[in-house]
A protein has these predicted regions:
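Sec-dependent N-terminal signal peptides of Gram-positive bacterial secreted proteins and lipoproteins
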Residues: 11-17
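A solvent-exposed interaction/effector surface
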Residues: 2-6, 17-190
């Protein structure tokens, strides 16, 4: 009986910790302009990110993490934000970390590593489908295809590659994870 109690207590603490840990990061602000039972259309304002192109996911994450940990011209530490995004650019993968909203192109520290670049992401409309579980390609591809099919059925024009948005770290329980598949779209009210 005591073992069951401690197991439940442990499980509850892990869930609570996972949830509160995920909620601690700044996210880019957006406005939902349309919603269906499968997806939503969001309008994002212009935002600043750092990005790295890679063939090996771990090295790119490390490059970006080093930048926010102080590997920049000002040796300035920058708070982590969510989501971390990835998209396919021909045969390479681009990974991006959004910078906190207090930074502008003029005030953001310059990366020390030439593999890391600052980028302004233009404002625009994005179709988004949310899912839990792991962020592996198989799960992302499944949800990305559901989103693509729904957008085609609704005659919403896709104008960019599929984007994987990851909101939680690897220690978050899969059932508690927030992942998204996104497409930049040409938005006209349906």
């Amino acid at each position: 009986m005591i073992k069951i109690f401690f197991f439940r207590l442990y499980f509850f603490i892990i869930i609570l910790f996972s949830y509160s840990f995920a909620m601690a990061y700044e996210e880019p602000s957006f406005k939902i302009v349309h919603q269906t039972d499968k997806y939503e259309i969001r309008h994002y304002q212009e935002r600043l990110a750092v990005q790295s192109t890679y063939n090996n996911q771990n090295s790119s994450f490390r490059n970006l993490f080093n930048y926010i940990s102080g590997a920049n011209k000002d040796s300035q530490k920058i708070k982590m934000t969510t989501p971390v995004t990835q998209y396919d650019n021909n045969s390479e993968i681009v990974m991006q970390f959004y910078l906190p909203s207090k930074y502008t192109a003029k005030t953001a520290p310059i990366p020390s590593d030439p593999r890391v670049t600052l980028i302004n992401i233009e404002e625009g409309y994005y179709a988004v489908i949310r899912y839990s579980g792991n962020a592996r390609d198989k799960n992302f591809d499944k949800h990305s295809q559901i989103l693509r099919t729904s957008l085609i059925e609704d005659k919403v024009q896709i104008i960019g590659p599929s984007i994987k948005a990851i909101y939680n770290g690897p220690f978050t329980l899969p059932i508690m994870r927030r992942n998204e598949a996104m497409f930049k779209v040409e938005w006209k009210k349906l």
